[in-house]
Curated annotation (Swiss-Prot):
This is Cysteine desulfurase IscS. Belongs to the class-V pyridoxal-phosphate-dependent aminotransferase family. NifS/IscS subfamily. Its EC number is 2.8.1.7. It holds the Pfam family Aminotran_5. The lineage of its organism: Bacteria, Pseudomonadati, Pseudomonadota, Gammaproteobacteria, Enterobacterales. It comes from Buchnera aphidicola subsp. Acyrthosiphon pisum (strain APS) (Acyrthosiphon pisum symbiotic bacterium). InterPro entries: Aminotrans_V_dom, Aminotrans_V_PyrdxlP_BS, Cys_deSase_IscS, Cysteine_dSase, PyrdxlP-dep_Trfase, PyrdxlP-dep_Trfase_major, PyrdxlP-dep_Trfase_small. PROSITE patterns: AA_TRANSFER_CLASS_5 (PS00595). The gene is iscS.
Length: 404
């Protein structure tokens, strides 16, 4: 078995061989290397043609019109474009935005940026299982609210939000609805013909495509208007200027084709492996599930092991590539803001591990991972004075610790 075993698919995925092979045809002199904006010769025409094909492939997976797809550098840029673009264009109608405390940093930091520009932002606290309270959402939509931004699947705990119901609430209140679907596109069926979402962000590298390319869905009917962030040649219908990376777009299109073909089998495969993993570790003493198995995505399992530091466990599990949270924030020693928003105390948040599985994960790898987790937890707790006190019956919550 090859080690380390990769269990960090929520951070990024390997590029499918078919995707990489196809991308190579759009890089060199022997292939289609032209600029898709060059309208005066065959090299440009051919590049534009394959970009249009990829745009169609992407739209087919999510039930969109190809003209509603705007290419970006990834989901972070898409989130920025959606939120800042709507806020800038529609600020005369209102300057209030609603989001949640458990959103990705690219949404939260964008909202904080807008607060410094005179906007007000309401950050909803989810229920303990991570789900947004729809009644609370309704109460917080005001006359000057212009945008609600809620992610579909949380990148740390995998909880799935009811974007269908949220979209209806937003439509009834005349408010734009943006969805960060980075962790759901290609894993959970989404049909934008049936769900009235106005803007949706997604990325290629989360579904076995290349890094550095993503998209923003912008609804045409009824038309959604926003101001661009990047100005220049007026590419992407004026919403995102810059020469299109044809090879990356082709790779993204191919990864979306494969996702559409494999989404059902992937879902079954991921659900099976996640259940095996949880069933294999749930009997460890003082283990806590930081999500909801019934309302969670098939590829993410977030667990806390009390009396074990998450960072220490990651170091002990050197044969497993896992995360102590979002890849974008796991370098921080602060406990996960997502888990803290769910009411989880700092000690448990610090002891959390995110396992995220993917298309290439095998049952044999999961079984091996379970054995490694058991072994490492046992060894680390043997070294922990807190664990010894807990096992001796000491109520650690009643102790007043000195902070020097």
């Amino acid at each position: 078995m090859k080690t380390p075993i990769y269990l960090d698919y929520a951070a990024t995925t390997p590029v499918e061989f078919e995707v990489a092979k196809k991308m190579m045809n759009y890089l060199t002199i022997d292939g289609v290397f032209g600029n898709s904006a060059s309208r005066s010769h065959k090299f440009g025409w051919k590049a534009e043609e394959v970009v249009d094909i990829a745009r169609n492939q992407i739209s087919e997976l999510i039930g969109a019109d190809s003209r509603e797809i705007v290419f970006t550098s990834g989901a972070t840029e898409s989130n920025n474009l959606a939120i800042k673009g709507i806020a800038s264009f529609h600020q005369n109608k209102g300057k209030h935005i609603v989001t949640s405390k458990t959103e990705h940093k690219s949404v939260l930091d964008t909202c904080r940026y807008l607060e410094n520009k005179g906007f007000t932002v309401t950050y909803l606290t989810p229920k303990n299982n991570g789900i947004i309270d729809l009644n609370n959402l309704k109460k917080n939509i005001k006359k000057d609210t212009i945008l609600v931004s809620i992610m579909h699947v949380n990148n740390e705990i995998g909880i799935i939000q009811d974007i269908n119901s949220i979209s209806q609430i937003c439509r009834n209140h005349g408010v734009f609805f943006h969805v960060d679907a980075t962790q759901s596109v290609g894993k959970i069926p989404i049909d934008l013909k049936k769900i009235p979402i106005d803007l949706m962000s997604f990325s290629a590298h989360k579904i076995y495509g290349p890094k550095g390319i993503g998209g923003l869905y912008v609804r045409r009917k009824p038309r959604v208007r926003l101001l661009s962030l990047i100005h220049g040649g007026g590419h992407e219908r004026g919403m995102r200027s810059g020469t299109l990376p044809v090879h990356q777009i082709v790779g993204m299109g191919e990864s979306f084709v494969l996702a559409k073909r494999k989404i059902h089998d992937d879902f079954i495969h991921l659900t099976k492996l996640k259940n095996i993993l949880w069933n294999g570790i749930k009997n460890i003493e003082e283990v806590y599930l930081n999500s909801d198995l019934q309302q969670g995505a098939p590829h993410i399992l977030n667990v806390s092991f009390n009396y074990v530091e998450g960072e220490s466990l990651i170091m002990a599990l050197k044969d497993l590539a896992i995360s102590s949270g979002s890849a974008c924030t796991s370098a921080s020693l602060e406990p996960s803001y997502v888990l803290k928003s769910l009411g989880i105390r700092d000690e448990l948040a610090h002891s959390s591990i995110r396992f995220s599985i993917g298309r290439f994960t095998t049952e044999k790898e999961i079984i091996h991972a379970i054995k490694l987790v058991h072994k490492s937890i046992h060894r680390l707790r043997e070294l922990s004075p807190l664990w010894e006190m807990f096992k001796s019956g000491v109520d650690l919550n009643s102790i007043e610790w000195d902070h020097v």
